């Protein structure tokens, strides 16, 4: 896992998926949600329990796109249930999403 580059992995059942959080992942998310990039702040603040899984989902798709490989079939609701059922996992992924968006998570100067 290389969180500083927005690279991590997530286990969904018996499968492990690579996640790549970069501008393209956010572009894919915005295109899917039919929203402008500037609306991400509103999305994260209004519904963080959906925002984090949504970013992770598009990070999974982005990781495959950048390698030129077919996208995996990921059931969004199943993935969200796994992420939201484990507070530690949710916090870890939230921090990774925040870092990919340029948030320092209270770690200024480090």
Predicted feature descriptions by range:
Residues 27-33:
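Covalent nucleotidyltransferase core used to form phosphodiester bonds in nucleic acids
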Residues 51-62:
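Short, hydrophobic/amphipathic alpha-helical patches that form generic packing surfaces
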Residues 21-27:
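A short, sequence-level motif marking secondary-structure junctions
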Residues 1-11, 16, 34-46, 50, ...:
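Charged interaction scaffolds used for protein-protein
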């Amino acid at each position: 896992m290389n969180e500083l580059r927005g690279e991590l992995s997530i286990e969904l059942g018996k499968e492990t998926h690579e996640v790549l959080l970069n501008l393209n992942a956010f572009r894919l998310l915005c295109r899917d949600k039919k929203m402008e990039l500037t609306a991400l702040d509103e999305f994260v603040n209004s519904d963080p329990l959906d925002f984090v899984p949504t970013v992770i989902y598009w990070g999974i798709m982005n990781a495959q796109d950048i390698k030129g490989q077919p996208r995996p079939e990921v059931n969004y609701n199943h993935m969200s249930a796994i992420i939201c059922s484990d507070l530690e996992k949710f916090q870890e992924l939230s921090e990774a999403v925040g870092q990919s968006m340029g948030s320092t998570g209270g770690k200024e100067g480090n």
